[in-house]
């Protein structure tokens, strides 16, 4: 599934709401999600191939921190935190694994008591906490998941949206509402 913006080709298609020439006074909060034609964003319904991982690694390299809710943090930690058993994933997954492992992570959760894996809990008023993260110096924040992005969209805090549309129907799972 290669997202291609230059010619619209490939099996997946990237739709972004912000032109690359836009400059922000604060570091931008970017939201990127894979979604099927029926709006499903369940990672199990979307095959993760080499091109898709390469695209998401490029997105990760445009940010200096990741912002997750509890569910997304736990899912990403289970998938990417080292050590991965030998032979458990193809070599082409290593760049994204290394990038995610090295990234600073912020986790919005009232349920978790502590986090590690280069992560910090975000508590208190969501609007103020995220605005504070955006005011910090850096390249940007990359947001993933479903529930937290919905809350942040309602607060008007997301600066860029990217939907990587997968040409399939899932028929089940969470939807990007």
Residue ranges and their predicted role:
Residues 7, 18-19:
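Serine/proline-rich low-complexity intrinsically disordered segments, especially terminal tails, linkers
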């Amino acid at each position: 599934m290669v997202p291609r913006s230059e010619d619209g080709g490939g099996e997946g298609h990237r739709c972004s709401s912000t032109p690359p020439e836009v400059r922000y006074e604060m570091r931008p909060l970017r939201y990127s999600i894979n979604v099927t034609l029926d709006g499903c964003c369940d990672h199990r319904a979307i095959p993760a191939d080499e091109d898709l991982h390469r695209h998401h690694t490029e997105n990760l390299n445009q940010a200096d921190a990741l912002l997750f809710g509890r569910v997304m943090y736990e899912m990403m930690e289970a998938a990417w935190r080292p050590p991965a058993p030998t032979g458990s994933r193809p070599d082409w997954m290593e760049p994204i694994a290394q990038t995610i492992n090295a990234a600073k992570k912020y986790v919005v959760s009232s349920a978790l008591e502590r986090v590690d894996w280069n992560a910090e809990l975000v508590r208190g008023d969501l609007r103020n906490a995220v605005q504070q993260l955006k005011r910090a110096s850096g390249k940007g924040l990359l947001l993933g998941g479903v529930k937290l992005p919905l809350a942040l969209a309602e607060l008007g805090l997301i600066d860029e949206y990217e939907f990587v549309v997968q040409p399939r129907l899932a028929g089940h799972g969470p939807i990007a509402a």
